[in-house]
Amino acid sequence: MIPYNHKNNLAGFMEKRDLYNENSEVTSKTYFKGDPIPAGYYPMVVMICIQNSNGEFLMQKRVLSKGGDWGVTGGHPKSGETPYEGMVTEVHEELGIDISNKQLEIFSQGCDGVDCYKMYYLKADYDISDFKIQEEELTEVKWFSIETLNHMIETGELNPNQVACIMKCYNYLNKKSK
């Protein structure tokens, strides 16, 4: 198998993305997935915490080739997409649902020296059967209580890069309810 890069994009998986500055502002610079990022520029990462009316959070389990761990839905906006549009695209690609008419709340955003990021929150009720998962990326989706998520954090069952997202969302919701 030939490793993917934009120069040998035989399968049509070329993914061009915009680069951002340290203030999370889009620049005129772009890069292709897998290419090195020039100094002083950052890719945008978007993530979403979806919570149902029972207080449970939707988690997705990645295929083994992508770590095989649980995490929230997320990814990188394609070139020309805003972070919001990228989040809508990622949710549609990975979960098979359209959230373009839903009210998303940003609960955290910034740049951490590696990535720029926007973290979104959505309160919505979906039945697991509503999801049409992207089988190349996911094996299952499931609703989890905050207690179960805390246990999964302690046992390392969650994607370590996304524990911060879950904790920030939980803190956001606690502040919002007061």
Regions found by a protein language model. Give the residues of each.
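Nudix hydrolase/Nudix homology domain
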Residues: 6-11, 65-70, 79, 112-178
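Acidic, metal-coordinating catalytic segment for phosphate/diphosphate chemistry
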Residues: 3, 8-47
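Acidic pyrophosphate-coordinating catalytic loop
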Residues: 36-41, 108-119
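A glycine-rich, hydrophobic loop/mini-helix early in the fold
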Residues: 45-70, 74
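The catalytic Nudix box helix
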Residues: 59, 71-106
